[in-house]
Structure formats: C-alpha cells, structure tokens
Amino acid sequence: MMEPAPLIYAAPAKLNLTLRVVGRRADGYHLLETVMAYFPLQDTLQFSLDRGGGIHLSCEPAVTASVADNLVYRAAERLKTGFGVEQGVAIQLRKQIPHGAGLGGGSSDCATTLLALNRLWGLQLSAAELAEIGLGLGADVPIFLYQRAALAQGIGERLSPMPALPAWHLVVVNPGVALSTVAVFKAHAAQVGGCYTPPGAAQAWLDGGIQHAHQLHNDLQQAAVQLCPQVGSVLEALLEQGADGVCMSGSGTTCFGVFDDEVNAVNAAQTLRQNNAQWLVIEGKMLHTHPCLGQF
C-alpha cells in the first residue's frame, strides 16, 4: 500500500495588539482581554504516518528539553490515547519563532499539530472539540485553532471575531533574550497590588476595531521592562525609527512598531538590523487570517 504524502503546514506567530489583565481566578490563571492577529514569522511542521504506532518528533534546530514535554508531542499523545488511534506519526518541526518571546510559537505548533492529526488520522473532531483539547494544553492554543484575528477573553477560551484590521506595516523585533511568562505575571501583580485593569474595553474593540496606533497597549509591558531592560531599549529604538506606535507582544520579549508606509518600515528594519546584530528584526504586514486557513 502506498503511504499518503506527508502533510506540511505552517504555524504562524501571533501578536497581541492589546492586552489587559482584568483579574485572576482562584486557581491562579489570569483573566485577560486581548486582541490577537497573526504575523508571517512561522514554524513549519511535517506529518507522516507511522504504521508502527509510535510518536516520533524531531526538531530543527535541536532542543535540549525532553521531547515528551514539547507541546507538539503532548498534542499528538493526547489525540492518540484519547481516541484510541492505532497509527503513529513522525513529526518534523522546523523552528523559526523564538522561544519565550511572547509570539505563541509553542501554542501555534500545538494547534497546527491538532489540526493536522485530526486530518491525518481521520478523527473528524469538530472545531469545538479541538478547542477544548487545545485549551487543556495551553491558554493560547485556541486562538491558533480559530485561525482568524480575534478578541480573546477569560483565560483565552472565549473568542470573538475582530472587524477588519488596519493594513499596517510592522517591524517586529526580538532582542535575543527570553522571559518567563510566570515571572512577568508575578512582577505585574506586585506592581498593581491586586488592582487589575477594569474590564470593559472589549466591546469597544469589537464595535470599532483596532484602527489607530494609540490603541496599542499591554498591561504586562512595564513588568517586562523591569525584568528585562532590553525590552525598553527595543521600544525606544522603534520609536526613534519613526514608528507611529509601539507595543510589546504577550509577556515579552518581542516588541513591534506599526508604520503606515511600507518604505518607512523596510528602512527602519534595515537600520535596526545594522545597529543591533543580536536582534531578530522582521518587517511584514499583519495577517487577519491563519496562513493555512481552509487547508485542514
């Protein structure tokens, strides 16, 4: 029997255009209101059937952490054991999204794995079933399963489609250092002393969208700068290059600047690369939909 051709999919980065921490649950999870869109920095995953029934994951570049702790492996294992799948899978993961950068790379890889294996193994799980499984693996996983720019509320499980987003040109910068999400939220909690941002901005975002650079905001940004001054340096450098607005994504350390003009964005990115060899600098347009929308 001829083996089916491998499935190859992209796993894009996400950017938080706004992020407000509006509370904390008794179990320690923080409640958020955040608008997320995609950006064309992406990992690539290849999936091939394994008739032996095993789950095999290889990563490029190689990682030192246990493969069993990788969200890709955990997603495959969750589907295989949860639904009695006899077939296995060989997964090749090529990483481009930095770790600990606030871009959701691990969550994106996880979501792509759930979507791909739902097809490869013929599970025919619904979007709601996949979202429930994804949320159990990570709070950011559902937004990547949703495959559209969205407002996320709660711990990330309540998703609403966003109106059309501006055709901004972005310069996305990672300073080459990582931050612990737990550490950033802990520092933020110490700064606000339990007085979280009042909820309520979400409806305005849904009604009017995110149209202006001054709407960019991240409640975690101050805490991240305190823990990692390089974040502040990146934000300042983007403003110096003429960005109309700047913001940190997620819990950091990646930041981005928005530009109305593509030429200005390209020039800014080039200057930042020349002046900061250790920074990852990428210019591109914000994406309203997942690059693999309709392929699953």
Swiss-Prot record:
Pathway assignment reads:
Isoprenoid biosynthesis; isopentenyl diphosphate biosynthesis via DXP pathway; isopentenyl diphosphate from 1-deoxy-D-xylulose 5-phosphate: step 3/6
Keywords for the protein's UniProt record, in alphabetical order:
ATP-binding, Isoprene biosynthesis, Kinase, Nucleotide-binding, Transferase
So what does this thing catalyse?
A: 4-CDP-2-C-methyl-D-erythritol + ATP = 4-CDP-2-C-methyl-D-erythritol 2-phosphate + ADP + H(+)
Indicate whether Cell membrane appears among the record's keywords. no
Q: Which domain of life does the protein's organism represent?
A: Bacteria
GO MF annotations, alphabetized: 4-(cytidine 5'-diphospho)-2-C-methyl-D-erythritol kinase activity; ATP binding
Q: What does the record give as EC number?
A: 2.7.1.148
Q: Which of this chain's residues are annotated to bind ATP? A: 98-108
Gene Ontology terms: biological process: isopentenyl diphosphate biosynthetic process, methylerythritol 4-phosphate pathway; terpenoid biosynthetic process
Q: Which family does it belong to?
A: Belongs to the GHMP kinase family. IspE subfamily.
Looking up PANTHER family in the UniProt record yields: 4-DIPHOSPHOCYTIDYL-2-C-METHYL-D-ERYTHRITOL KINASE, CHLOROPLASTIC
Name by which UniProt lists this protein: 4-diphosphocytidyl-2-C-methyl-D-erythritol kinase
